[in-house]
Amino acid sequence: MKIHYLLFAFLLVLLSPLAGVFSKTINNPVSCCMIGGICRYLCKGNILQNGSCGVTSLNCCKRK
């Protein structure tokens, strides 16, 4: 039974760096541009807000 706990702990430590790979966090202008968005203060009309551009007042906006 101890080997199961050891294996679980090993897998947890081994796979923990991959957690950031699956989430699409947009928090800088480069990642905003990579998804086809632009940094604006307001997202109006048929444009959706996908995240922020690093500064709290700028939003990453992308068309629907």
UniProtKB/Swiss-Prot annotation:
Recorded superkingdom: Eukaryota
Predominant cellular place of this UniProt entry's protein: secreted
A Pfam family this chain is assigned to: Defensin_beta
InterPro entries: Defensin_beta-like
UniProtKB keywords: Antibiotic, Antimicrobial, Defensin, Disulfide bond, Secreted, Signal
Localization per record: Secreted
S-adenosyl-L-methionine keyword on record: no
GO biological process: defense response to bacterium
Disulfide links within the chain: C32-C60, C39-C53, C43-C61
Signal peptide stretch: 1-23
GO CC terms of this entry: extracellular region
PANTHER family linked: BETA-DEFENSIN, DEFENSIN BETA 4A
Function according to Swiss-Prot or TrEMBL: Has antibacterial activity.
Similarity comment: Belongs to the beta-defensin family.
Protein name: Beta-defensin 5
UniProt organism field: Mus musculus
